[in-house]
């Protein structure tokens, strides 16, 4: 084998490796976004188990309403129960959260970090309210796929 042929072969191998790792990285980002969407899209009494299946154990949560933080193996379910109690006490109904285009999706090995704008629309005492917020999520890749390890919601 001559030097040119060897150099060409090495170049092709390197390019193939770079392209396949870039593709895998893009797939990881897509999977991370899908996991976050699967969690939020299933926050409802009829589909809650699907949302909870995206939560890792343990999970840490920070949110705007008391007690403001939840952690442990049942944190996602505990947060959902606290949210419903808070909403009932404060006459909040018809809540709907929508994510915008992610500002940041970073994947490093089996860990990921996701940040996106969120719009939360609801009625309080019958009046429409619209909140702009940031939604930040830390995820961990498991054998079952990407799972939420922590998340935080903050009004802007």
Kindly give the residue locations of the regions a language model identified.
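Hydrophobic pocket/interface hotspot
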Residues: 39, 50-52, 59, 72, ...
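Bacterial N-terminal signal peptides that target proteins for export
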Residues: 1-11
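Surface-exposed, charged secondary-structure patches
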Residues: 77-125
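Second-shell loop/turn segments in exported
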Residues: 26, 38-41, 62-69, 125
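Short, low-complexity N-terminal intrinsically disordered segments enriched in polar/charged residues
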Residues: 11-13, 17-54
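Short beta-strand edge/turn micro-motifs at domain boundaries
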Residues: 130-156
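A mature extracytoplasmic/lumenal domain signature
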Residues: 55, 65-66, 116-120, 152
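A short gly/proline-enriched turn/hairpin at secondary-structure junctions
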Residues: 60-71, 88-91, 107
């Amino acid at each position: 084998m001559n030097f040119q042929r060897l150099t060409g072969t090495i170049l092709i191998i390197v390019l193939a490796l770079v392209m396949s790792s870039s593709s895998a990285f893009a797939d990881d980002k897509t999977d991370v976004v899908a996991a976050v969407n699967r969690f939020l899209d299933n926050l409802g009494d009829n589909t809650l188990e699907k949302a909870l299946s995206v939560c890792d154990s343990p999970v840490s949560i920070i949110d705007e309403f008391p007690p403001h933080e939840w952690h442990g193996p049942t944190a996602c379910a505990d947060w959902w129960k606290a949210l419903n109690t808070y909403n009932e006490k404060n006459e909040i109904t018809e809540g709907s959260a929508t994510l915008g285009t992610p500002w940041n999706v970073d994947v490093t090995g089996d860990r990921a970090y996701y940040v996106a704008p969120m719009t939360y629309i609801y009625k309080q005492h019958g009046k429409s309210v619209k909140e702009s917020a940031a939604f930040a999520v830390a995820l961990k890749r498991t054998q079952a796929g990407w799972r939420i390890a922590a998340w935080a919601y903050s009004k802007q």
